[in-house]
């Protein structure tokens, strides 16, 4: 097989060379004003969204379907002809607002809707890249994003586009004009509430109502994480569920039930406070900042809960107590939620009393798991920041399998399949500072808080039965610090410096068998991997790299088949769709995110990477389209 590649070039030079290769490259520059010229007129129905994982002409939901598998049945572009893939068009987001571009685009009725950094939305003609309209949200100065000014995507339903903002709003736009239909504030942005994840649509089987589901961000600033359900037509809240034990939920505008036990025994008592609980309980995190999956069969929303606040394990443990006695529910795990009421149906915790900021927000992929006994279980697949891959029964939250997907995990030896709990290694929870000192003794931990895999979503292939996991091999020095809550300030109580594990690589794209935990193949990258993954029926796996390459691999062997230099690092999930008989593949480009802000030695490693902001679309040239058919 032949590999087509381009050298590292400045973006303008790259665009010119790509034009010569493709013969059809359309470069479009963005503008800030909305323009009404969208060709999209057909409204999106729930049936469209429910079948998103089966259909090919649109991409309507984050994860490319409610199951979040990121697998496409398209095979026009395949392992035999992918070397012919060339740019169809590229759109520049424009102006100085670059930073991390982590958005997964959606596609409907010939229009690409892609969000950008600083809470922006662009509507583009899917065939030409022509700008149809732009929405620029006006952000206040006192926003508190923890991990860059990113936005991970939008949702679509009816005649509206929905997305969240860094000042804690959910906004509905007319999908044809970009004009605001409604705008709902859900939290105090000056206290750290933001929204970076893409909202999703689900249909409650009990009521028959379609609901718009979204979470909040802000664990690093001491928020209490909340999951919301809204009426997609009006934006009105239907219910809200907090993910810290003992905090009160809402249903139809009124207090409903507390999450778990109202006495919150998994958080220590403190008779000196107004609440009777330790300070951390009032600022306990658990924010579901990533997008939810939806199991229509069991009528369950399944979403990850974020890390507890603060990171410091001793702030969430009674004085002279044992952290293992205080699990900090309902944080750092996966939650099954009833869409009718917002009640918690089940909860599985990946990291009890999480001392390492492992969180639980990484995507939850719905798939059929076949165990060693041959029994098939409707399950979730989850590659956690803590370095372990989990298979959980999505009907009841019971653990089915767990195994490491990265090397040299130090904090735990394994996950006990009987108890479902990690078997921790001694000395990996950093000790309190000694009397008179402000900082505890550093401990070397792996994975570091940025995780064996972070938010960037993996893919599952229905053909190979493998998960394709974009992970990182690294470690950190980690130590405790004194911590007290102050509104709008970081609420961590930990210090850190991320370091290399290996000299020749950090990122690893790994294909793994969920039944056996076996590593089938891996591809190594010098820089951290922060892009998502796409798998297709064409025996292909696509992902992007920190140094700007968009790559395709053989799904069975891991052989690199094609790559293209986009001019800036890629930290987003790719998508694919079919239009007028041709397969298109798109990816958002622009380096940033958490690594250059929080990454220690890794931030130094990525300094040479250029920033950017653009959306690239690839296809096999139309004149060669016949040879692209299998």
Tell where the protein language model's regions lie, with residue ranges.
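Repeat-blade elements of multi-bladed beta-propeller folds
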Residues: 59-63, 98-120, 145-169, 194-220, ...
